[in-house]
């Protein structure tokens, strides 16, 4: 068990110390009603994940937002392990940006962790007036005590990868992090590594492009991203743009957790590959493809070939394993990245997806499978959709997954999700030899929510996790 410092700040001194942290007992995740037909606000659900609890795998609390149609998406903290050395800091507020509304909600999870309450609403009008941006997305806490939230658009819905700074105590909007006029053309995710004076960010598409669903013609027109932007952390400006070969729609990007590392990985959704970015011998940054998921030739789908669609990636805290989800194919994969240049597949599990046997899609040619996977049934429920957002326990032994991507795309690719709601599943992980196995006793069915089926998204543990905490 990790030793808890009584005079330290939030989180843990190192990623390896974090692995010794306590087992997760509750999980927070946003649930979305936009595009479901239910006229109710999105809400933050609290789920009990303690096997010893009588409420195990149940929603124990729901905090509705005050407005409709926010499209809650990702979440972050007011402070995390980057402030471990500051005993005045406490991880007690969850930051919830609204992808469509551009509001940012600050939720108090410190007073009653099992019953969060709304602390503050940062209105879109304040963000727009001070920063001239919209479509708030990823939130990370900084060692300065500030919170940084990136954006995807300008006020007209064009692409604009900007970074909004919030005061970590008052949550007032302070302005943008990047220099005036220095935003990237588009945005999505970001990760920083101060020891090397660098931040990296990715790009999805302009809000006008993605907001109403996926149109293949937009890909042909070059309206989706394929670049990594490398920023000077101290000067707040782009110093390099990495144009990826065969790297369409780079979404989640992660440096290795080791704060001295000079490499990481990005998941490219549409081209369905994992690319490794790294500092080269010249001191600049390079990128190379290290994993490719082959598309499947299909019949009965919107296109003749179906990509895996890698939508989320995670690194274990010891930087040994890489995990990612193929939302369309329906599997989660585990790779040993002891040699980051040559990841080795060590585990794979199918949790639904678009190619299950007996569905509307027939696979004509498959480079990996000899037959279509069976539909997943857990506790008598056939699981709709495919695995999307994933979260790993601190010790690396449990992987949680939800099945909703973004309500407009859910509606298009998995209409069953809209009718039935998404689910939360749990997979047991073999951290010795590698391997993934479903826990048949765990199911959170968001199709049975009191106000109607809901779409659950990103998962957060109260004490921090593999995708929220950055060590400096």
Swiss-Prot record:
Phosphoserine modified-residue sites: 467
Membrane topology qualifier: Peripheral membrane protein
UniProt main location, coarse: nucleus
Gene Ontology BP annotations: protein transport
A GO term for molecular function: selenium binding
Keywords from the named record: Cytoplasm, Membrane, Nucleus, Phosphoprotein, Protein transport, Selenium, Transport
Tissue: Mainly expressed in liver.
Family matches, as InterPro entries: Se-bd (IPR008826)
One Gene Ontology term, aspect cellular component: nucleus
Compartmental location: Nucleus; Cytoplasm, Cytosol; Membrane
Pfam families: SBP56
Record's comment on post-translational modification: The N-terminus is blocked.
Superkingdom: Eukaryota
Keyword match Glycoprotein: no
Biological role stated in the UniProt entry: Selenium- and acetaminophen-binding protein which may be involved in the sensing of reactive xenobiotics in the cytoplasm. May be involved in intra-Golgi protein transport.
UniProt similarity note: Belongs to the selenium-binding protein family.
Name of the protein in its database record: Selenium-binding protein 2
Source organism: Mus musculus
Gene name linked to the record: Selenbp2
